From Swiss-Prot:
This protein's name: Imidazolonepropionase
Catalytic activities: 4-imidazolone-5-propanoate + H2O = N-formimidoyl-L-glutamate
Gene (UniProt): hutI
GO biological process: L-histidine catabolic process to glutamate and formamide; L-histidine catabolic process to glutamate and formate
Annotated residues for binding of Fe(3+): H74, H76, H244, D319
Length: 407
């Protein structure tokens, strides 16, 4: 009989989808197991026959499914306003250029976010965060990028820090100052990149407000030379990098980010084989964002088969934002990744657990159920992991455990 220490907590009588690749079964499944949690971490996984049937801090899950906590590794959670009106305009035939000329597009969100009080932004973002938590998310990336000026970018990152301080969910904050050229720099995008590189990145990094630097390398964003300036600045300061790349065209952004050992290359609909090879060589995760693909009614799909062939880890994320992916649901993103991009359900699960953890640099502590990892996991009223992917409108979450505590 396994001896428990005072303070240990046990979840017994569970069907465990560990997502541990060292286990041979699909999803790393093992039956009739018990989890021992100690000081917020997984202490051990043992057959339930080795434990007492009942006792203090022993939870009988009656055969329910347990998975790692979900990880949403790409969101734009902090913003004000919405873009429903311009979405309706687009569906009625208005072009993106026409909408932008009227002050719409990303600059509409920038204007609303700049004008919004920090406390209001916090309350808006908190509600969104709790929606994701209700689906079993325990680690969440939050990007800035709707300020495009020092003061507002800092405001957005302070909101992310305030959310993290609640200890309801882990937050990985990302500086995305190189998201778009603000209206005041419309005729001088290089000047704006200078502001990002010489002021925003060093000052906000010194304040400890973010974990990584992101950028938008695209025909409607920043070119390769401008993007490389951002990457060089970040790397000189020892900051991890990532990038929105190859979403609408092939510019070579994935190769660029991979040369700087980027954590991830995100979107990647137009990714080519050279880019896939570069990602493999750079250890860069490919992050699929099917919500934006769906909402923009795109037709160019990411090269999933090439990513498999080159064994590039593939993550899946919600990309929750007001303009191109207003879907605050990781379950829906998993379903879309399977239906639209051809992932298997097991690949989708890997994409919101261990591969998503790698995309945030947290692969040594998050995304799997194994000894030594954080005790972040979800108990589901389900028999198989595929059920969560198959029916995204139904949430079978029974219990969410964060840092070893039921939340």
């Amino acid at each position: 009989m396994r001896q428990l220490l005072p303070g240990d907590t046990v979840w017994r009588n569970i069907r465990l989808a560990t997502m541990d690749p060292q286990r041979q079964a699909p999803y790393g499944l093992v039956d009739s197991q018990a989890l021992i949690v100690r000081e917020g971490h997984i202490c051990d996984i043992v057959p339930e026959t080795q434990l007492p049937v009942s006792g203090d801090n022993i939870h009988d899950m009656q055969g329910r499914l347990v998975t790692p906590g979900l990880i949403d590794c790409h969101t734009h959670l902090v913003f004000a306003g919405n873009r429903a009106a311009e979405w309706e305009q687009r569906l009625n035939g208005a072009s993106y250029q026409h909408i932008s000329a009227q002050g719409g597009g990303i600059n509409a969100t920038v204007s609303a976010t700049r004008a919004c009080a920090e406390e209001t932004l916090y309350l808006l973002a908190r509600e969104r965060m709790m929606r994701l938590a209700s689906e079993g998310v325990t680690l969440l990336e939050i990007k800035s990028g709707y300020g495009l000026e020092l003061a507002t970018e800092e405001k957005l990152l302070r909101v992310a820090a305030k959310l993290a301080a609640e200890n309801a969910i882990d937050i990985s904050p990302t500086l995305l100052a190189a998201h778009a050229t603000p209206a005041e720099y419309r005729d001088d995008p290089d000047g704006y990149i200078t502001l990002v590189c010489e002021t925003m990145i060093p000052q906000l990094w010194q304040k400890g407000l973010f974990d990584a630097v992101d950028l938008f390398c695209e025909s409607v964003g920043f070119n390769v030379a401008q993007s490389e300036r951002v990457l060089q600045t970040a790397k000189a300061l020892g900051i991890p990098v990532k990038g929105h790349v190859e979403q609408l065209s092939l510019l070579g952004g994935a190769q660029l980010v991979s040369r700087y050992q980027g954590l991830s290359a995100d979107h990647i609909e137009y990714l080519d084989e050279a880019g896939v090879a570069a990602m493999r060589d750079g250890g860069t995760v490919g992050v699929l964002l099917p919500g934006a693909f769906y909402f923009l009614r795109e037709t160019q799909r990411p090269p999933v088969e090439l990513l498999r062939r080159y064994q590039v880890p593939v993550a899946v994320a919600s990309d929750f934002n007001p303009g191109t992916s207003p879907f605050c649901s990781l379950h829906l993103a998993m379903n879309m990744a399977c239906v639209q991009f051809g992932l298997t359900p097991e690949e989708a699960w890997s994409g919101v657990t261990r591969h998503a953890a790698r995309a945030l640099g947290r692969q040594a502590t998050h995304g799997q159920i194994r000894a030594g990892y954080r005790a972040d996991f979800v108990v589901w009223d389900a028999e198989q992991p595929v059920e969560i992917v198959y029916e995204p409108g139904r949430n079978p979450l029974y219990q969410r455990v964060y840092r070893g505590q039921i939340s």
